[in-house]
Amino acid sequence: MKKYRRALALVSCLSLCSLVWLPSWHVCCKESSSASTSYYSQDDNCAIGSEDTQFQKKNEREEPSNAELSGKSNSYLTISPEGNKIKDDYTVDVQDLETTKLSLPVVEALPTVDLHEESSSVVVGSETIENSSSSSTSERTPVSELDEVEKSGTLSIAKPGEVEQPEADCDAGEAPDADAPVEQPAFVSPPESLVGQHIENVSSSHGKEKVTKSEFESKVSVSEQDGGDPKSALNTSDTLKNESSDYTKPGETDPTSVTSPKDPEDIPTFDEWKKKVMEVEKEKSQSLHPSSNGGPHATKKVQKNRNNYASVECGAKILAANPEAKSTSAILIENMDLYMLNPCSTKIWFVIELCEPIQVKQFDIANYELFSSTPKDFLVSISDRYPTNKWIKLGTFHGRDERNVQSFPLDEQMYAKYVKMFIKYIKVELLSHFGSEHFCPLSLIRVFGTSMVEEYEEIADSQYQSERQELFDEDYDYPLDYNTVEDKSSKNLLGSATNAILNMVNIAANILGAKTEDLTEGNKSISENATATTEPKMTESTRVSTPVPSPEYVIKEVHTHDREPSTSDPPKESPIVQLVQEEEEEASPSTVTLLGSGEQEDESSSWFESETHILCSELTSICCISSFSEYIYKWCSVRIALYRQRSRTVSKGKDFVPPQPSLLLPVESVEVSVPQPPSGDVDSENMEREAETVDLDDLSSVHQGHLINHTVDTIELEPSYPQTLSQSLLLDVTPEMNSLSKVEGSESVKSEGGYIPSQLMTQESSVEFDDKTEKKTESFSSAEKLSVIYETSKVNEVMDNTVKEDILSTEVVTKFPETVVPPPMNTATVPEGESVETKPSIADTLKHTVTPVMDPSLPEVKEDEQSPEDALLRGLQRTATDFYAELQNSTDLGYGNGNLVHGSNQKESVFMRLNNRIKALEVNMSLSGRYLEELSQRYRKQMEEMQKAFNKTIVKLQNTSRIAEEQDQRQTEAIHLLQAQLTNMTQLVSNLSATVAELKREVSDRQSYLVMSLVLCVVLGLMLCMQRCRTTSQFDGDYISKLPKSNQYPSPKRCFSSYDDMNLKRRTSFPLIRSKSLQFTGKEVDPNDLYIVEPLKFSPEKKKKRCKYKTEKIETIKPADPLHPIANGDIKGRKPFTNQRDFSNMGEVYHSSYKGPPSEGSSETSSQSEESYFCGISACTSLCNGQTQKTKTEKRALKRRRSKVQDQGKLIKALIQTKSGSLPSLHDIIKGNKEITVGAFGVTAVSGHI
């Protein structure tokens, strides 16, 4: 506890001294640091994206290295008590206290940025460092912190920082705690400035991606989780830097936030939105900001105007060309094998329609074809419309006889009139050509310019740029040379004070020949604390060192810096240097990055040398601390190389330890030489000797293991290098891995670098230490830088240069503390002389070893990086090489001065970080507000659109429902109608069916009736036919043949006589057919008239019978009326027949041959013949059947009558012939000559009067 209190007291005194000692220097440091800080912030912004991407890769690599670092850190922690003793030995100067205070606020600014839990712990460590003056840091005992660190397995950066800070607090408990921690940050701040500068350069050169602070923090937290070692602390510190830069980037990207609203439908998350905005802003800022610088501005314009608007890809086309031209569109295609072919003898011209109206800035024309003539002079005309007769001649361009792309940029002054015109059509006319070939092909033509949109964006961006210029500059927009310029300005501000400090650094370097190791321990602890303060990196390094020793080292280191830069030389705290070594390597790449700007590195180196000589002599503690930090860094790099070389033997556990003890001795001597530090330093050195002796073994083993892990990685990168080289490369590789978790890599680098630098410091502890150490340091630092560059290249592969810059800066910061730590270890192990002797050998070895490492790392970097970042890295490497040569030519003090300037810049960079963080917070607030406004607007719009759509939908639904209801009603009505119609139809159909059934029944009945009637008719017809057949069958055919064939009718008499003979009772078979048509009226027909209808056929039997009884049956027909002769001879019956047999009464026509009554004396035969004749009359039947047999008297009377009538018969015959001449005669009737149809019955008859 006493040690802790002493250390705290020393630190507080140093901080007070730093504040009070040299205000002018403090101001200068602030300015330089601010410049570096601002530049660093810019680089951080650029580096954030790369770091974010690379952190993940490196975190994976760093996990093994973190374990190694944890082991190393444990060893460092054990060694740290000695450092604490040394710190106790060192008296705290007020100047140192002031310096620490100054650095403290810077450190506080760093921890202000909150990472994830692990990063937060790191931040806490840095904050405790910053607030080391406060009791919070002192409250936590280093032992408890160490325990926690040991428990954690991986030394989380925050915890080690906290541990170291409490130790410092305990030591400085007597003295103000704030001062001691502040001193450590102050010392650390210079490395941060270096780191910031390197990072800035790297970020500017390599910053391709930009990541939001939250994203970067998340990535950093992941990396920290992967390795909780001091490397993670370093990573967190870098993360803080990156965060500050990130905040700046959001501000820069503010104008681009408008881009996000372009997608109103898609509402991205804040991180996505911010990332997009930052990326857009980054592109714009990269193109716009360099405009302030002539060269970069041209580059910016080229970048902005690198759109070829005469390309087929964007829609350009050939509108017209000379008719001989072939494949005219080939000139718009980026294909070397395609070309427009024209004979040289023709007039070659063509018109191109560009993709869009642009302000023409440049023309490119090319002819790749061999054995052809290339264009020499060509006229270019422009127009805003086509076709046109007013082509504006832009000018005649003269080409070269080359078969490649020839560019013709337009001078804005000469073509100011045309450059501002927006044209879309270009006419090119080839006026002449080189050579005498037949063909003049043209392979390519390009037109570059600015479109209306780009011009508008430039104006808007320029306005926004003017508003946000500071923020952009701070973030990442400064060119690689920016830090150099700032450094120069800061250097100028430092002035003679810086030179005095540099001189003091030189003196300290001489002292460091013997005591550098002690100072190195103090510086190491201080740098570690500073690293933790600056970022978790410092915390990391502090954690690595033993809690108590590290505060002591910090106090000692701060005090030493305040007193003498030599006191804070690297040799002391090798354990911390190991942690710092990784950081140093990373930091060295950062430094290389700064150097990458070439001019910056060279100028800074020369300036540092001069200023270091001037200022270090006067302002040894403060300015030398900053310059000395770089100086320590170089020594650390040298010692790292030596340690790498020795790490092989160190793995065995022997070679590594002896050189460190030797280093410790020189540190003691240095501390003794220092007025205040000597006593405290001696004690602390003893402490450190013991602790370091033990820790060096552990550290050597751990360091070896860590190096082994690095070797594995390095084998891939540099398998050909020897183990030492591979170790150094591994350290470099480890920083890369650590760059993923920056803390881990930085810690391992610190420890390793710490050993080697301490050894180098021990070697240079002699009076020659200044020159030798400077040279060696320069060589080793350059080698280390090369390795760092290699690391950086790898880091660039894994991460963006921004991340590498942060890592490198962190490493540099850590390396300085590491350099401080190794001396105590060496002191404990070996006397000063031994340490010095060992150092030279180690330094030489390191030089040899590091030199190869440098070379290989450079080519590897070149191989690894092919991008502009690679070019930057190569430039940085060349710059580093030049810078290294300059450093060799110059003294180490000069380089230390450069580091000093960086340190001062770093201090200011811390303040600037705070400012940047504030601005970043403002930017974030503005972005958040803008994002919220955008979200609210989008939400409002979406809600309005949704509401409108909903209303429309409701209206449509209502309309649809109303239409549907109407349709339903109509359909319902139609259905009802259809149903009614259906019922009616059903009824109709049923009625029809019933009616049809009835009709069917009626028809069937009728049909049945008809059938029945037909049947009856048929039956009746058949019956009639049968009867007819029977009747006809009774007649005998002979009867007809027997009839007389005389043409004359028998006389009536004969007939009557024959009638007398007939048997009247016999019925005739054929009665006379009655016919109304043949009825004789009483007027016309007399009873005496006789109508013969048809001959009666009598069967022979009947004839015989009739003849037989003829005499007996013949009756005399007496007319009822007497016949009165008429004048014309007609005879009229007086009376109608009264007899029933009379014709009148009968009403029937009898067809028969009328014969007069037979004469009484006629024979029987004659009577028979007459009878036969008479029988032909239809009335015969009635006569025959109706007459009764007459008596003889009647027969006689009849005969007399017949005789009388015989004459009358003739008369009647004549009458009949005359009156009814149409009537056929009986003979005719018999013969069938004539037929008479009577009535419907078709009876043939003859009508006539009898």
From Swiss-Prot:
Residues with the Phosphoserine modification: S1077
Topology term for the membrane: Single-pass type I membrane protein
GO biological process: ossification; positive regulation of collagen biosynthetic process; positive regulation of osteoblast differentiation; regulation of bone remodeling
Pfam family, one: Sad1_UNC
Tissue expression as described in the entry: Present in chondrocytes, osteoblasts, osteoclasts and osteocytes (at protein level).
PTMs per UniProt: N-glycosylated.
Residues passing through the membrane, by range: 1007-1027
Acidic residues: bias regions: 164-177
UniProt note: phenotype after gene disruption: Most mice die neonatally from respiratory distress (50% on a mixed C57BL6/CD1 background and 100% on an inbred C57BL6/129Ola background). Surviving mice fail to thrive and show significantly reduced body weight, skeletal deformities and spontaneous fractures. More than 80% die by postnatal day 10, and none survives to weaning.
Residue ranges the record marks as coiled coil: 905-1005
Span of the signal peptide: 1-19
Cellular component terms per the entry's GO annotation: membrane; rough endoplasmic reticulum; rough endoplasmic reticulum membrane
Family annotation (InterPro entries): Galactose-bd-like_sf (IPR008979), Suco/Slp1-like (IPR045120), SUN_dom (IPR012919)
Basic and acidic residues compositional bias, start-end: 55-64, 206-218, 240-252, 271-286
Top-level taxonomic group: Eukaryota
UniProt keyword list: Coiled coil, Developmental protein, Endoplasmic reticulum, Glycoprotein, Membrane, Osteogenesis, Phosphoprotein, Signal, Transmembrane, Transmembrane helix
Localization, UniProt: Rough endoplasmic reticulum membrane
Boundaries of every SUN domain copy: 283-452
Main location group: endoplasmic reticulum
Residues carrying a glycan: N201, N235, N523, N924, N951
Compositionally biased spans, kind Low complexity: 120-144, 1159-1168
Functional note: Required for bone modeling during late embryogenesis. Regulates type I collagen synthesis in osteoblasts during their postnatal maturation.
Protein name: SUN domain-containing ossification factor
